[in-house]
């Protein structure tokens, strides 16, 4: 019996779904449609030229194999996209291998969040390119996007995608040398190597990676020796065809004091920007998060949270956790009326000034503004000063040197160190994370009050 084009494609999808990892199937295969079937060839339509190109390089062989299994004979495969680009594939000689083989003996990466996988990442219009690019890198490192530079604000999913690459690659190839490090860790390793006279060991460690994932690269600004060492590490890996993925809160050209040669290297691949998620994506994120927490949320609650928490995913998920915790403790039903008081959605924000932050920090930690601007190393003053620098960088557009000036003329490297330290601590210390959230709320409330007076 002769198959219709749609019947053939349905069978192709069923077989591919059982053979491919779910993220790969959903991103590359599931979005494609069959356009034409003749006795000589099959035309497949991809959603856009980006997906078309990846299908051509990585999936035509397996599609051709499945089509031949179903039909009992081979036919040519042609690709087209909804935007009019076409690639003709005649036979199997032009089809790329499905997965390249990597070998290695290095230990697996450490400190990966088990939740940061592709299957738990919610794709929306704000992050579709970044998601597709990271998945492409995970499947075929060193081929299409090298380096891959992810940029976007705090809490938008850059770290999630970077660690998803590591999880995916290690699941497929457990012996792969995949290194995930923060810029702070790279710098600390370099400092330790210098102190212990073991620079060669440091270089051999990083320069034998198959995939190097470096988070928060913006903190390399002002660190001249770290930039020098990273430049040579980057070159060694890139020339060997190894994959480098970098994440930052801003594009390369906007990182202060970053050397031109690094800006050039970081810009030579793909720069994928991650934007703030739209309402539909925020609702999907909340729904998925609730499912993982085994909670059923009414649609009106999801819509309420998604409507009022718009800045980033971290803020959004934090609101959901507060809601679930409150309902669990109080025993109340999950309604907007019951949750509205505890959620306290953020309001319109006014201008946040350095003076505002200094005064709030001084009041909270019972120190004076002069203490914050001074050089005292007393633990309580030093911590308050570091938190103040962290919050000033988070909530203002001031440069590092300008923030240093607001704290009594501190060097920009001191500001960088303080930001790095608090940023790392808050990821491990729940109390500190909550304190920072509360301080941020106070800053925004005060700025709004200041705006209306």
Swiss-Prot record:
GO terms for biological process: DNA replication initiation; regulation of DNA replication. Residues 1-73 are annotated as: Domain I, interacts with DnaA modulators. Residues 73-110 are annotated as: Domain II. Keywords: ATP-binding, Cytoplasm, DNA replication, DNA-binding, Lipid-binding, Nucleotide-binding. Residues 328-453 are annotated as: Domain IV, binds dsDNA. One of its GO terms (cellular component) is cytoplasm. The keyword Secreted does not apply. It comes from the Bacteria. Pfam families: Bac_DnaA, Bac_DnaA_C, DnaA_N. InterPro entries: AAA+_ATPase (IPR003593), Chromosome_initiator_DnaA (IPR001957), Chromosome_initiator_DnaA-like (IPR020591), Chromosome_initiator_DnaA_CS (IPR018312), DnaA_C (IPR013159), DnaA_dom (IPR013317), DnaA_N_dom (IPR024633), DnaA_N_sf (IPR038454). It is found in: Cytoplasm. GO terms for molecular function: ATP binding; ATP hydrolysis activity; DNA replication origin binding; lipid binding. Residues 111-327 are annotated as: Domain III, AAA+ region. ATP binds at residues 155, 157-159. Belongs to the DnaA family. PANTHER family: CHROMOSOMAL REPLICATION INITIATOR PROTEIN DNAA. HAMAP family: DnaA_bact. Oligomerizes as a right-handed, spiral filament on DNA at oriC. Domain I is involved in oligomerization and binding regulators, domain II is flexibile and of varying length in different bacteria, domain III forms the AAA+ region, while domain IV binds dsDNA. Plays an essential role in the initiation and regulation of chromosomal replication. ATP-DnaA binds to the origin of replication (oriC) to initiate formation of the DNA replication initiation complex once per cell cycle. Binds the DnaA box (a 9 base pair repeat at the origin) and separates the double-stranded (ds)DNA. Forms a right-handed helical filament on oriC DNA; dsDNA binds to the exterior of the filament while single-stranded (ss)DNA is stabiized in the filament's interior. This is Chromosomal replication initiator protein DnaA.
């Amino acid at each position: 019996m002769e198959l219709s084009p749609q019947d053939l494609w349905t069978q192709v999808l069923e077989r591919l779904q059982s053979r491919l990892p779910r993220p790969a199937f959903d991103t590359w295969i599931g979005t494609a449609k069959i356009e034409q079937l003749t006795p000589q060839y099959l035309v497949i339509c991809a959603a856009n030229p980006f997906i078309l190109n990846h299908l051509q390089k990585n999936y035509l062989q397996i599609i051709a194999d499945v089509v031949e299994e179903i039909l009992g004979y081979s036919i040519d495969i042609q690709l087209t996209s909804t935007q009019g680009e076409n690639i003709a594939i005649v036979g199997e000689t032009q089809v790329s291998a499905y997965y390249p083989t990597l070998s290695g003996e290095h230990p697996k990466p450490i400190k990966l969040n088990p939740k940061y996988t592709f299957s738990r990442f919610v794709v929306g219009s704000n992050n579709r390119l970044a998601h597709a690019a990271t998945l492409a890198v995970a499947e075929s490192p060193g081929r299409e996007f090298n380096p891959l530079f992810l940029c976007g604000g705090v809490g938008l999913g850059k770290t999630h995608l970077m660690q998803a690459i590591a999880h995916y690659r290690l699941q497929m190839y457990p012996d792969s040398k995949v290194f995930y490090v923060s810029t702070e860790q790279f710098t600390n390793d370099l400092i330790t190597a210098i102190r212990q006279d073991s620079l060669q060991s440091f270089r051999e460690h990083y320069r034998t990676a198959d995939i190097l994932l470096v988070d928060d690269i913006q903190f390399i600004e002002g660190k001249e020796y770290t930039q020098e060492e990273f430049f040579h590490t980057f070159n060694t890996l890139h020339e060997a065809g190894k994959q480098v993925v970098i994440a930052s809160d801003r594009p390369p050209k906007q990182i202060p004091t970053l050397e031109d040669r690094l800006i050039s290297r970081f810009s030579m691949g793909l720069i994928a920007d991650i934007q703030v998620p739209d309402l539909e994506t925020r609702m999907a994120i909340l729904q998925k998060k609730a499912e993982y927490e085994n909670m059923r949320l009414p649609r009106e609650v999801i819509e309420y949270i998604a409507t009022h928490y718009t800045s980033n995913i971290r803020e959004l998920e934090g609101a959901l956790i507060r809601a679930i915790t409150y309902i669990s403790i109080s025993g109340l039903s999950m309604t907007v009326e019951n949750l509205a008081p505890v959620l306290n959605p953020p309001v319109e924000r006014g201008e946040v000034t350095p003076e505002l932050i200094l005064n709030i920090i001084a009041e909270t930690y019972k120190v004076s503004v002069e203490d914050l601007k001074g050089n005292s190393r007393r633990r309580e003053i030093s911590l308050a000063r570091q938190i103040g620098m962290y919050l000033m960088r988070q909530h203002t557009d001031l440069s590092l040197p300008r923030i240093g000036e607001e704290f009594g003329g501190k060097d920009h490297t001191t500001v960088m160190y303080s930001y790095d330290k608090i940023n790392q601590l808050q990821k491990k210390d729940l109390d500190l994370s909550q304190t920072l959230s509360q301080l941020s709320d106070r800053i925004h409330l005060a700025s709004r009050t200041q705006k209306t007076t």
